[in-house]
Amino acid sequence: HQITYLEGYLWDAPLAQESMVKAASLAKASNRQVALTLSDSFCVERHRESFKDLIGDYVDLLFSNEDEILSLCQQDETESALQIVRSFCDIVVVTRGAKGSLIATGTETLKIDAVPVNDVIDTTGAGDLFAAGFLFGFTHGYDINESGKIGSTMAAEVISHVGARP
């Protein structure tokens, strides 16, 4: 798999939106998959409809935490939000901290356990490292379940110390 990864934080600036749409369009024209991380529930609130358009038109893999996906879908329950997003996105990954993550594909939802951490020091970068681990596994031929476990392992490592670098 070749994947173009888009960062939701960049969506606030109109020029960045234009650039991200162009990158996604070029990726699709080159038979690449497109991944998007929503990054921030407040950004999702500001740009809900345009995010939905971007996801529906281009995104194959969506990464979010619970707050972000609930905001995107204007739902109160994660499962109901997953049902909505899975109708227009192939793979939806929702990180849930100590509760692990959910990965929705088509009609299946996988639950990935969080890797236990003795002392959580700093959660900065946990979602980013989860996405990096998942994408590493996915692009190296691992199935979605194993890719989720790699993501969980990466997230556990980064929260065990100060700072976002492993």
Predicted feature residues:
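Conserved beta-alpha-beta core of the PfkB/ribokinase-like small-molecule kinase fold
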Residues: 3-83, 99-101
